[in-house]
Amino acid sequence: MHRASANSLLNSVSGSMMWRNQSSGRRPSKRLSDNEATLSTINSILGAEDMLSKNLLSYLPPNNEEIDMIYPSEQIMTFIEMLHGHKNFFKGQTIHNALRDSAVLKKQIAYGVAQALLNSVSIQQIHDEWKRHVRSFPFHNKKLSFQDYFSVWAHAIKQVILGDISNIINFILQSIDNSHYNRYVDWICTVGIVPFMRTTHTAPNLYNLLQQVSSKLIHDIVRHKQNIVTPVLLGLSSVIIPDFHNIKIFRDRNSEQISCFKNKKAIAFFTYSTPYVIRNRLMLTTPLAHLSPELKKHNSLRRHQKMCQLLNTFPIKVLTTAKTDVTNKKIMDMIEKEEKSSDAKKSLIKFLLNLSDSKSKIGIRDSVEGFIQEITPSIIDQNKLMLNRGQFRKRSAIDTGERDVRDLFKKQIIKCMEEQIQTQMDEIETLKTTNQMFERKIKDLHSLLETNNDCDRYNPNLDHDLENLSLSRALNIVQRLPFTSVSIDDTRSVANSFFSQYIPDTQYADKRIDQLWEMEYMRTFRLRKNVNNQGQEESITYSNYSIELLIVPFLRRFLNIYNLESIPEEFLFLSLGEILLAIYESSKIKHYLRLVYVRELNQISEVFNLTQTHPENSEPIFDSNIFSPNPENEILEKIKRIRNLRRIQHLTRPNYPKGDQD
């Protein structure tokens, strides 16, 4: 039910109830309660209607599988941050800013309005201006030639016309909001769909505009050509292109229709580049969508560089390693430093260390012999073993028998020790193999456990915070990252070591991403790179192709301006004053002035009998230089040089249909 029909129904129902209540015999309180109930019901219906029209999006299911959300998305938000240098700087940002230049739009409107107004001047209007001038300041042929007389008026009328046209254009350009065109370019480069809204404005009053005009000629032209000025003023004041806040754009999978909402209210939109659906996945066709894979790779490399910079340049870093190769030597030194008195524990430890260092059978025998010699004084009586000379001869026979016993004892001890040591060595090797097997299993379990815990210990916002945090905070965060220690087996050695600083170099990657960004923009929008004689880039400007691709759709689809001629590319290198001067030189006014000059000169010649020197030739004297002064020639020559230097080609403007897409 529409609002108008509902209101009419409300009025009719109220009137009918009042008539019925007056004619019936019911009590006033009863009639009043019925009246209020009916009115309350109708008001509830109207309120529900308004709520439904304003909050249409809220009635959609939150997880509707039949809808592809185009915007907002994480990818597009990343694109917007890249374009405006939120985190990093790219060369593509400067190219994008050149594309957002609203000065091109202003020059286009100035050129189109000036071209339409100046070419709408009729020869009758020029002749009327001449007659008014003659009546105010007639020609008397006293020390003043007619050529000078007409030349002064022609230059004066030119300055008046250009001044009034300039005032009109400045008045129009003041109503241009630069942000609308900037957002238009941002939407095209990121999403490819431009939402917009129109405000209800009545036809603009030309009174304020006509206050900028001083001549009757331009005053009449503006009134006669209201279809030129009025649409421009109305279009500039009625269109609103929103930013990226509170905008939702989605695509219905069933109907394949795109819808756009702002604050849960449907708004119009213009599809510049239609998104595709490939393998049930929505794919954008914008320049930044084409660059997205390379931008992600480059961003990942930059984060890696930053992390390596923080990790490998930390002020204090100490690397430690075990020194097991000198442990035995230290033990021996400690034993030697102890007191020289015999100790069974010390002797036994020294004996075992000597055995572990022995690599051959002879070494083991020497170790055992030394051990026996060391402990022999404590178990054998030295007085009995070492006799004096007087008793030596008496004990000689006994010594031979004891020596045989000692040799036999040594051999038995050595044999027992060898067997025991061999048994111990075999057992040690078996235990070492078993230990290595269990160590590998434990390492695998630790690795799995640390892998599962890394997700909890790693901060997902670290990638975005590293570039923006202070150095001290970034270092503290990076130091808390999970690391895995690696154990090296005895049979392996370390082949490399990061004792020196390691930071990846991104110079080649930066240069490559800049080239890709420049290539995408230059070829998509056909921008023109201007270089000097040494081949160095001076600027990036619009070309004729760029104007047709961006400016013309903006004028037609958003401003509803269809009758402005596209500005030539060479005019983009001129100022507004030079543009007006160049348009004036190529307009019909110059030819009309020439015609009026010839006609008036013939009449003056008949009146004052002004002829050339040869009486047989009665043609009037004609000085064409008054219509071709030097400044105008300089402007035309400048345009010619620009056209030849840039090798500019002109295109035929496409015919865009009228109407907005809702």
UniProtKB/Swiss-Prot annotation:
It comes from the Viruses. It holds the Pfam family Herpes_UL6. GO terms for biological process: chromosome organization. Coiled coil: none annotated. GO terms for cellular component: host cell nucleus; virion component. Forms a portal in the viral capsid through which viral DNA is translocated during DNA packaging. Assembles as a dodecamer at a single fivefold axe of the T=16 icosahedric capsid. Binds to the molecular motor that translocates the viral DNA, termed terminase. Belongs to the herpesviridae portal protein family. It is found in: Virion; Host nucleus. It comes from Human herpesvirus 6A (strain Uganda-1102) (HHV-6 variant A). Its main location: virion. Keywords: Host nucleus, Viral genome packaging, Viral release from host cell, Virion. Homododecamerizes. Interacts with terminase subunits TRM1 and TRM3. HAMAP family: HSV_PORTL. This is Portal protein.
